[in-house]
Amino acid sequence: MKVLKFGGTSVGTVESILSVKKIVEAIDEPVIVVVSALGGITDKLLQTSMMAAQGDVAYEKEFSAIITRHLDVIEGVISDLEMRRSVQRRAMGLLDELGNILRGVFLINDLSVKTSDTIVSYGERLSSLIVSHVINDAQLFDSRKFIKTVKQFNKHVVDFEQTNQLIRETFNPLPKVSLVPGFISTSRDNGEITNLGRGGSDYTASILATALDASVLEIWTDVDGFMTADPRVINSAYVIDRLSFTEAMELCNFGAKVIYPPTIYPVYHKNIPIRIRNTFNPDAPGTYISREKEKYDGKALIKGISSINDTCLITVQGL
């Protein structure tokens, strides 16, 4: 069994969603597919909610653009008329809920963390609804029912004991294709919507892979894998074939935005490898990440270089 995660760029357009369909349907074993919101939608939801909280009536125009974006994608990816109308109705039901929440934010000029978390959750709820009707035989699941968080030091963290138990119960038996919205979770204590942070869809996929002992976690994105350096700075940079978990973590923590760093922890402890793949170049082998370190072959002592712009690192030490 594999877990595949597709990011916002991978589900951002009609063409990319159809590429996802082709990739998933070519796999001949059970898969869990985790999707992010359509590319740019999370930022759009945050921007729209902030405008509403500030009493800016122009939020309605931004919200209208969000509605149009989703309806256009549905129109482009679902050819069956009856199914398309059904998905449009369900999507409009979610969008109507979202519109009512935004209207409330506008009227009281206030946006709480709880309300913001609820608003951004609609991105993944909508994208997963759409993609689940594009991939043949896909069964849609609601991650709010099995990804549970607790609050520690004013931050939501995953309750792995309850989450793992719920995941195993939910995916028993395991369908041929399971479709799961990433990023979204709920509080263990009160059931309120929470989230796993920006990039949290990677983390969702890692949690699922760990709980279900997947053979591999595949992160499908818009690059061929980890690069030896930022290709925008070093034009001779190339894809790194293999990395250890430690090496990948170091690169991620210092600027390589290929994987959300917390993603690595769960699969590391279960020794489940990660493979970075490119949705737009699916034949590329990508980067394979595991516990095993490659032996030095005399060619390159340094695997890769990453950096964080406009940041100073200060080390203070004493005798």
What residue spans do the PLM features occupy?
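Nucleotide/pyrophosphate-binding catalytic subdomain
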Residues: 1-264
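Glycine-rich beta-alpha junction loops
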Residues: 38-39, 223-225, 274, 278-283, ...
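Preference for bulky hydrophobic residues occupying beta-strand positions
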Residues: 182, 274, 314-316
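Short gly/pro-enriched beta-turn/loop segments at secondary-structure junctions
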Residues: 212, 269-270, 307-311
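Conserved glycine-bearing catalytic or ligand-binding loops at nucleotide- and phosphate-handling centers
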Residues: 255-285
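A conserved regulatory-domain signal marking ACT and ACT-like small-molecule sensing domains
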Residues: 285-319
